[in-house]
Structures are given as C-alpha cells and as structure tokens.
C-alpha cells in the first residue's frame, strides 16, 4: 500500500554534512522525497512535536538536541513507507542497529542518532501536518 511518512534528519546530520548520504539510503530503499525543507525548531515546537515523550527522563535532552541546530524535515512516499523507512533507519540505539542502516552506519550515539521516522500511520499523518500543508507535498 502506498503511504507517506515523516522523516527528520537531525542536527547531527546537518552539522556533519551528511545530508546527501542519508538521502541516498532513503532513495535506495525505494522511497521518494515528496516534500522537504530545512528549518530550526524552537523550544516550543520541539516540545509540542515530542509531547508524547514529555514525562520521559530523556525529554529535556531531546528538546535541547533537536533545537541545537537546523534539521531537514521530509515527507517520504512509497509502498509501506512507514515500515520501510523504519527498517532503513535501524534501531534507536546505533549499537543495536543492523549494518547497512542509517543509524548503524552514521549515528554517533543513542542521542545523536541521525533520524526520526513516524512509527505508525496515525502519527505519520499528525507529524506531516505539523510541518507541511497539503499544497507543499508533491506527487512524484
């Protein structure tokens, strides 16, 4: 089934200049970038976006990291895009991620783990609408 998912290339990816490397993994998996932009999240935006984690002990550090520099937000489209992208990302902890995944090959730590991807269809829709209006998403 064709679906969409949100991808965020985190500040560590932008700072290290590996945006193109990460996008290569995404496209090699058969996913199409149908919307993309670079932005710098404010503290309030990061807190709202990651509100589901507000009560978790890592929340303050997550917000601090996600606001530490620019990010690249993308809408990806493809067959089973959510599951495919989660496979390409690899496990949250790069030490546990399979070789050949974005996190295994590029992430420096569990905190600076390169990418965010929606975990289910409802969250994908919510997360996409957080960053993009429908007129900003293009069919390819």
UniProtKB/Swiss-Prot annotation:
This is Nucleoside diphosphate kinase. Its EC number is 2.7.4.6. NCBIfam families: PRK00668.1. One of its GO terms (cellular component) is cytoplasm. Keywords: ATP-binding, Cytoplasm, Kinase, Magnesium, Metal-binding, Nucleotide metabolism, Nucleotide-binding, Phosphoprotein, Transferase. It is found in: Cytoplasm. It catalyses: a 2'-deoxyribonucleoside 5'-diphosphate + ATP = a 2'-deoxyribonucleoside 5'-triphosphate + ADP; a ribonucleoside 5'-diphosphate + ATP = a ribonucleoside 5'-triphosphate + ADP. GO terms for molecular function: ATP binding; metal ion binding; nucleoside diphosphate kinase activity. Major role in the synthesis of nucleoside triphosphates other than ATP. The ATP gamma phosphate is transferred to the NDP beta phosphate via a ping-pong mechanism, using a phosphorylated active-site intermediate. GO terms for biological process: CTP biosynthetic process; GTP biosynthetic process; UTP biosynthetic process. Belongs to the NDK family. Its cofactor is Mg(2+). ATP binds at residues 10, 58, 86, 92, 103, 113. It is an enzyme of class 2 (transferase). PANTHER family: NUCLEOSIDE DIPHOSPHATE KINASE, NUCLEOSIDE DIPHOSPHATE KINASE DDB_G0292928-RELATED.
């Amino acid at each position: 089934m064709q679906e969409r998912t949100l991808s965020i290339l985190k500040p560590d990816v932008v700072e290290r200049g590996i945006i193109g490397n990460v996008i290569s993994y995404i496209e090699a998996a058969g996913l199409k970038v149908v919307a993309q932009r670079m932005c710098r999240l404010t503290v309030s935006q990061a807190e709202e976006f990651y509100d589901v984690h507000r009560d978790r002990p890592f929340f303050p550090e997550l917000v601090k990291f996600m606001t530490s520099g620019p990010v690249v937000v993308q809408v990806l489209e493809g067959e089973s895009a959510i599951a495919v992208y989660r496979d390409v990302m690899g496990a949250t902890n790069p030490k546990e991620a399979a070789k050949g995944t974005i996190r295994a090959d590029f992430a420096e730590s569990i905190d600076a783990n390169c990418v965010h991807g929606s975990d289910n269809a409802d969250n994908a829709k919510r997360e996409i609408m957080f960053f993009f209006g429908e007129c900003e998403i293009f069919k390819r």
